Amino acid sequence: MAKPVAASFLTQANALFKKNLTYQKRNIWSNVRLIVIPLYLCVVLVCIQAVFDSLVNNSVDNQCGCRCADDDKNGDGKCEIKSCGLQYSSQNQAVFCAFPNPPPLLPLLHIPPSVNRDSCQRTGSCPVTILVTGNNQSLGTTLSENLLSTSFTVNSSSDLFLRNLAYNVLSTTSETDYTNYRDPGIYSDLPIFNIQPQCTPATILSLSFRQPPLEFHKEVRCVQGLNLWRNNSLEVNDEIFKGFRKENHEEIINEVAAAYDLLNTDRNKFNVTIWYYTTYKGDLQDWRVKYVRVPRSVNMVSNAYLQFLRGPGTKILFDFVKEMPKQETRLRMDMASLIGPIFFTWVILLLFPVILTSLVYEKQQRLRIIMKMHGLGDAPYWMISYAYFLAISTLYIVCLMIFGSAIGLKFFRFNDYTIQFMFYFLYINLQISIAFLVSSAFSKAVTASVVAYIYVFGSGLLGAFLFQFLIESLSFPRRWIFVMELYPGFSLYRGLYEFSQYAFQRNLNGRDGMKWKDFRGSAMDEVFTIIIVEWVVALVATYYIDRVSSSSKDTFAFLKNPFKLSPTPQMLSFQKERSDVSVEMEKLDVIQEKETVKQLIFERSKNHGIVCDNLKKVYQGRDGNPPKLAVCGLSLAVPSGECFGMLGPNGAGKTSFINMMTGLVKPSSGSAFVQGLDICKDMDKVYISMGVCPQHDLLWETLTGKEHLLFYGRLKNLKGHDLNQAVEESLKSVNLFHGGVADIPAGKYSGGMKRRLSVAISLIGSPKVVYMDEPSTGLDPASRINLWTVIKRAKKHAAIILTTHSMEEAEFLCDRLGIFVDGRLQCIGNPKELKGRYGGSYVLTITTSPEHEKDVETLVQEVSSNARKIYHIAGTQKFEFPKEEVRISEVFQAVENAKRNFTVFAWGFADTTLEDVFIKVAKTGL
């Protein structure tokens, strides 16, 4: 027959694609449930929003205050007419009221409360400090004297009430709010302070003024302003920083009211720097900040400079500050924007456990390795698997965006859809790559699933309660934010956080959501860069690890080699001892097989499908245990057309040998060739001409028997009519064709049917080398005989290595047998040779009553004095006779004579069986 031709990349990819497509069609509802998960979660978010609206957004405290204007109730206690306005509102409610004509407010300066002024604590006098520095101390002193007014007189009934107040420097200890519709300095019970160079008791006044619809009565107290010169700005910075209540390490709080650096100001130019406390803006840095009372500081120093230039009569009066008109509003808190980062982090990361578990499941069930053994290359596997997960993930993300927008989530609707899609698309690629990368670290799907879900929920929680706090912290270094974003969960969270902030701003104040023009101004450019780089790195790392694991090398061998230690004395001694023992104990037939192997290697013969030369496998000892020598110097040559049977007790090394030959593990030493190809260097080429029937059936439960064979047939480069014919013949040969059995999912097959399908898979495409591990396990006698016939027919054009515990199967199928004990080949030959070599005796089995056991022993001794008892229980005895000492007729005659003296219930006389040979060799080799 022609040499098998390797399937091309496209052929392999097509085979896997069709198999996966069929598999996914059978699991369509699982895929649908996965894709519509975003819909369920978006509905949950809508429900949360509805609950929040009813409890918070629609609360009386979060809307303009009202009172009932209808005295005539309808008896149901409901108010028909309400009157709402500022006069009925609390401080919290006022911000929601309509302000068609916002009232003018006093431009107050913020001064520290008395508890934050060190002089109040030490001396009892409480001046407020104003710091001044600059290049010209003389000019600075002059301007300092012009900062404050020296008297306070005002007529509250005058039409120019605010203008009269503007001649004074009024201040308050109250911080501002997020708007200027109601200034806490005026609307609170706190007094207003007039800052003067000197205070007298007469400077304490009371004022009454109206800001429709409200009227205020405020007490105006005098507070001394202490102007202090400092040599440079460093001293000012140091004094402000150390005196602030939150940062002083000397426990001396001395905050200042204002601070100026006049720099190079002179009569020809006015150049000044003004200090103020940014802390009063609030904790959030991006979307909402409080006002700070800087305008009055600017006006003070400007007036001081004008008076320096033009005299004391020249001033720019700062009459009032005023907000823009606004309509009545209500609290608008969009939950999708508030909890969007953590919520959608969980939503998107939910794909990660699905991908990782799927990959690990294929590895755990050894589905990938069985595909590889039948010719599927790594590149087609990764490409098709990646494409499938990318398609599912993309559908998932698109559905998330569509569902979220359809039900009105502002998180999606307010931000540019192209930016969102690009971000999600890049991240799901990174997520798939990371799943491929970390799948190599797991061997069980359950463990992988648990770890993946910990990663999912842990990333969301850490992002919300740690990472977001650090993002919003003004003091946390930005470079460490970048380092934290290298963790994929945080890079996802940061991108979602940016979307939520832009959506929140749009909902709060009407500014645009995120657009491409905002890309560089936000953190998205940084996040995109991190995701793209990590995606590439993850793909490269995955490729490296997969190549290393495919060649059975240590993943981190390149790190260990420089420090690799020489074999330990224990290891060397162990190997030498075992080698010496094996040389002494090797039989002539085993030695002859070694000579044959050496001759074949020397001649570079390709007539033998399998050639193994001194193949060894040593497993390193653990926990102080010595190394385990699983296969000890095996030499074997199996020509095409031969079925070689491997017999041996459990743990003899048969499985280790098969694993080496199929590429699951790498030999510790020695070499092996399949069709002239070295299994250590050319395993990918070996797979082209190889078929494997594993001990445990490796099948897809939802694929039919026919679909299994179509897939593996395509991997063997069968196409069109040849493929269909090969599949049909394979199904017929193992009795899985008639009655529609071929179109039944393999999950519904019986154990025997699955076994027959596994054999058919191993033989499809006429492989040149086939490994079968107990192929007839679980079959009924009729099916077993039929399967043996199929295997016997297949060996005409292939070299087959078969392991079995059935002596009948070994005798029927195998041209030669090898018995393994303790990692060594004890004997080799065809069944008749082995029985002749290790048999040499007959076995008499006879059953009588227990009281006649001695009579039976006497009878046996009369026939052969060298006979020995090998079995005895409850009247049944077995005796072994040397063939050269007895004749069969003598035994028959002796038993017939014995029947006249006592009752013989049953008896039998047999030649040595293969099982007897196996037991004898196994006992001898142990």
Curated annotation (Swiss-Prot):
Q: Which residues cross the membrane?
A: 34-54, 336-356, 389-409, 418-438, 451-471, 525-545
> Could you tell me the membrane topology recorded for this protein?
Multi-pass membrane protein
Location of this chain's protein in the cell: Membrane
Q: Which residues form the ABC transporter domain?
A: 610-847
Q: Which GO terms describe its cellular component?
A: membrane
A GO molecular function term, named singly, is: ATP binding
The alphabetical list of record keywords is: ATP-binding, Membrane, Nucleotide-binding, Transmembrane, Transmembrane helix, Transport
Q: Would you say which domain of life the source belongs to?
A: Eukaryota
- Principal location class: membrane
User: Which residues hold ATP?
Assistant: 648-655
Q: Which family does it belong to?
A: Belongs to the ABC transporter superfamily. ABCA family. CPR flippase (TC 3.A.1.211) subfamily.
PANTHER family (UniProt xref): ABC TRANSPORTER A FAMILY MEMBER 3-RELATED (PTHR19229:SF154), ATP-BINDING CASSETTE TRANSPORTER SUBFAMILY A ABCA (PTHR19229)
Name of protein: ABC transporter A family member 6
Upper classification of the organism: Eukaryota, Viridiplantae, Streptophyta, Embryophyta, Tracheophyta
Q: Tell me the gene name.
A: ABCA6
